[in-house]
Amino acid sequence: MMAAPSSPAGSAVHTVESLQAAAPARIVVVIAAHNEAALLPFTLPPVLAQLQPGDELWVIDDGSADGTARVARAAGAQVARRARPAGSKGQALRWWAAGAGAHVDGTWGVLVLDADSRPGADCVAQLRAALQAGIVAGQALVQPVDYAGGVLRELGACSELMEQLLDDTRRAARGWPVRLRGTGMLLRGDVFAAAVRRLCTRIEDVELTLFVAAAGHGIAALHAAQVLDPKPASSRDAARQRARWLRGQVRVLRMHWRVVLAVAARGPGGLSLLGSVLAKPRSVLVACKLLAALLLAGLAAHAHALPIVVPAVLLFMWILPDAIYLARGLRLPQTRGLALRLVFAPLYALWWLPIAVLAARREGRWRSPRRAAPDTTTAPLRW
């Protein structure tokens, strides 16, 4: 499915725009890497196999000490090596765009992948077709893999799939933009260059989403193209990753509040997009609503007070869409078999408490721990 319908008349956000050139779209795949020599042999060959003559594959070696640049060159990628680490994926992308990637213009499409992500069958071809159809920015379907065997990992993967297959599909059907997700992000070259120079936090996917939407461009859900994305190998690694997200959300609100207001001013589509990137974590928000409703219901039953019954009923009605959403999500082919895991949902919500503590601590080097290979071996990314 390529969910990229035209926007309705009068919509503030347009899904499809004209490509600058009539020539076939060229693709440049960009992978920012810090000490990823163990991962790149699994990532680069599937990418190279899908490229056409004229396309490019770049690995940004951000001050690695493990031979990342050597491994990337041996695999056939072009390498831009930064001797002093930029410290984050967003900063590495900005550095590349200002130097080795300065030739990328509106006739190119920029596909950003993580060092451990693997494109699905015909992924690049589907994204190229989207560019030629006039798509300015889009997000491939991020398909979680290597998450079986851990309750928290399985619940996280289920949540990620439901958000894409339900929420993003609904937004696309209404001509609204969807969020970018860090890997599988496709942007036309000129749009990428304009947005990437403003990156300054460690959640570059949220920043790029806001910058592109605030500029009036649509972000299409390109679910015909899939990117396989391994999940963190342990709950501890996943907690560190999510702590970085929470910390980044605070920085985004503090540093880009004008951009947030500009996106909100674009109407329902903009507000929906803001909810997608900033109203997180959803599990905690739903849990808070449920606890508040149960508390009010208990008070009403104890005091027999009608003024308390009314808000309790309203809160339960507010939770009803979440229950319907969950029921629909568990009927998806990709999430079948996970219904029994819902007994651990309260644990998943409570898991965010130590994450909030981690987020409040001093920020260290950016980390995105993942499985190292498509087998049972695990190793964290050390960025």
Residue ranges and their predicted role:
Residues 45-54:
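Short, acidic, metal-binding catalytic loop of nucleotide-sugar glycosyltransferases
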Residues 26-28, 56, 207:
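Cell-envelope/extracellular polymer assembly enzymes that use nucleotide-activated donors
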Residues 88-92, 96, 100, 126-200, ...:
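Long helical/loop segments within the catalytic core of UDP-sugar-dependent glycosyltransferases
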Residues 58, 69-99, 141:
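Conserved donor nucleotide-binding strand/loop of the catalytic core
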